[in-house]
Curated annotation (Swiss-Prot):
Record keywords: Cytoplasm, Methyltransferase, rRNA processing, S-adenosyl-L-methionine, Transferase
EC id: 2.1.1.177
Organism of this sequence: Dictyoglomus turgidum (strain DSM 6724 / Z-1310)
UniProt: S-adenosyl-L-methionine binding residues: L70, G101, L120, S121, P122, M123, T124, F125
Gene Ontology CC annotation, any one: cytoplasm
Uppermost EC category: transferase
Subunit-structure text: Homodimer.
Catalytic activity: pseudouridine(1915) in 23S rRNA + S-adenosyl-L-methionine = N(3)-methylpseudouridine(1915) in 23S rRNA + S-adenosyl-L-homocysteine + H(+)
Phylogenetic placement of the source organism: Bacteria, Pseudomonadati, Dictyoglomota, Dictyoglomia, Dictyoglomales
InterPro entries registered for this protein in UniProt: Alpha/beta_knot_MTases (IPR029028), RlmH-like (IPR003742), tRNA_m1G_MTases_N (IPR029026)
CDD domains to which the protein is assigned, alphabetical: RlmH-like (cd18081)
Protein name: Ribosomal RNA large subunit methyltransferase H
Location within or outside the cell: Cytoplasm
Chief place where the protein resides: cytoplasm
């Protein structure tokens, strides 16, 4: 089982970098997560930016990967439901790849190529916060799955 997270944009906020590093460290006993930061084209008009980002995202996805797109219109799951779904998926798919889009999200083609759209919240988050929240929820999912203290 391997997780990869593709993130359009860089981490700029030091406190988020610290949080991301903390959760990556906490996750090491369970899984090694690879995070790839992809260039953002936010300075371009929306359609052009989405097309350029789509091209780069698709270059970083392999055919055997189960793709989960983070999208505010995706399925909304409780932490327990996310844990159950994640561990069911990993029994069938050794490679899970999460995609966090840039300021415009991801293109419709990327959404259509994914197997699952996941919403972290009805609210919109920056790519940085989305990454941190996703890592925390993955960590929580492992703790729930193992019946270990953390989730209350």
């Amino acid at each position: 089982m391997q997780f990869k997270i593709l993130v359009v944009g860089k981490l700029r906020n030091e406190f988020i970098k610290a949080g991301v590093n903390e959760y990556l460290k906490r996750l090491l006993p369970f899984i090694n997560i690879k995070i790839e930061f992809l260039p953002s084209f936010s300075e371009l008009p929306e359609k052009m930016a989405l097309l350029k980002e789509e091209e780069i995202i698709l270059k970083n996805i392999k055919n055997n990967e189960f793709i989960i797109i983070l999208d505010k219109n995706g399925e909304k799951l409780s932490s327990e439901e996310f844990s159950n779904k994640l561990f069911k998926l990993t029994t069938l798919n050794p490679q899970i790849t999460f995609v966090i889009g840039g300021i415009y999200g991801v293109s419709e083609n990327i959404k259509k190529s994914s197997k699952f759209l996941l919403s972290l919240s009805p609210m919109t988050f920056t790519h940085e916060f989305a990454l941190l929240i996703l890592l925390e929820q993955i960590y929580r999912a492992f703790k729930i799955n193992r019946n270990e203290p953390y989730h209350y």
